[in-house]
Amino acid sequence: MRLVFAGSTSTQALTITVDDAVTAAQGKTIAAATSVGTVDFTAGGVSDTFANLTTTTAVSTNMQAIDAKDANVNIVVSDAPLASMSANNVTALNALMGATTGTVTATINGNGAELDGLQATGTSSTQALTITVNDAMSGSSGVTSLNAI
């Protein structure tokens, strides 16, 4: 994908509606192509790998640029599944889910001790998470951890 404007290298005041899913890098390029405050990514949203959507514990700069133009963007984490989630991965996923009021879709797995750090449903985004807990959890502490997930 490339945006070209004959005879001009400056940012234009364009109203942009994106019809297909874009990667984080493509979305940033589209967002940067206009000086208008919003870009509508609603039709296709963003679909990319976890590494391209986040940093170690935060949202990537590409995703931040998209979110700045469309705070309700839907996001699909294309890695299936995000295996053996670490505490940092959970923090980054929470940041991604907190960056949009749209739907975040991901398939994840990991140990209960890390996964219980996932933000609860009812925060700013709708979360469509498929979660697999890899370790055995038992007793009241296991029930508490599973309820947190």
What is the predicted function of each stretch?
Residues 1-149:
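Solvent-exposed, low-complexity segments and loops of surface/extracellular structural proteins
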